[in-house]
Every structure is written in C-alpha cells, then in structure tokens.
Amino acid sequence: MTFTKACSVDEVPPGEALQVSHDAQKVAIFNVDGEFFATQDQCTHGEWSLSEGGYLDGDVVECSLHMGKFCVRTGKVKSPPPCEPLKVYPIRIEGRDVLVDFSRAALHA
C-alpha cells in the first residue's frame, strides 16, 4: 500500500468533512468523533459533493441534493435514492497527518 498525506487532522474538526484532490480523484475525508474515513466525494446518485454539500450525522453522510445517505465507514447506501455504494479508501493517521492510499479504492456492496 502507498499512503500519501491528504491533510492534517486539524483541518477536519469532529463531525466535519474536507475535500482533497489527488490526481483526478476528489476524495472526502470525514472525522467521526476523532476517527477518520475516506470515500469518493461525489454522490453516486448525482454530481454532488458530499464534503461540501452533505451533512454528517455520526458515521452517516446525507447528500443534500436528494437526501440519499451513505455509511462513511463502509460506503454502503443507508437510504435511497442512491443504489450504488461509495468507493472507500484505506486511511491511517501518523502523528497529525491523515494518510490515504488513493490507489486502493474499494466497493463494499
């Protein structure tokens, strides 16, 4: 696995999200009570940013475009209209750095 620094833990307060870009990928970094998760940033139902236009409640992000919900831990759809899960990325914390393996996105259907 190749982990790359995506941001600092200080850039993503608890209950918030941050969009980061790597190559052509836009990825959302979520802070769920000090635990960090990385998913694709775009809702699978419409072209909408989950980090900039979503609402995080616990480990579930709601897309504000059509109110679909996803688990940020697994990418699984929690509430339609989306039917496709989000890609999730391996993530780890080293010191104050949030590291993501952008090459290993996975779907957990």
From Swiss-Prot:
[2Fe-2S] cluster binds at C43, H45, C63, H66. GO terms for biological process: catabolic process. Residues 4-100 form the Rieske domain. InterPro entries: Rieske_2Fe-2S, Rieske_2Fe-2S_sf. Pfam families: Rieske. Keywords: 2Fe-2S, Aromatic hydrocarbons catabolism, Electron transport, Iron, Iron-sulfur, Metal-binding, Transport. GO terms for molecular function: 2 iron, 2 sulfur cluster binding; metal ion binding. The keyword Electron transport applies. This protein seems to be a 2Fe-2S ferredoxin. This dioxygenase system consists of four proteins: the two subunits of the hydroxylase component (BphA1 and BphA2), a ferredoxin (BphA3) and a ferredoxin reductase (BphA4). Belongs to the bacterial ring-hydroxylating dioxygenase ferredoxin component family. This is Biphenyl dioxygenase ferredoxin subunit. The gene is bphA3.
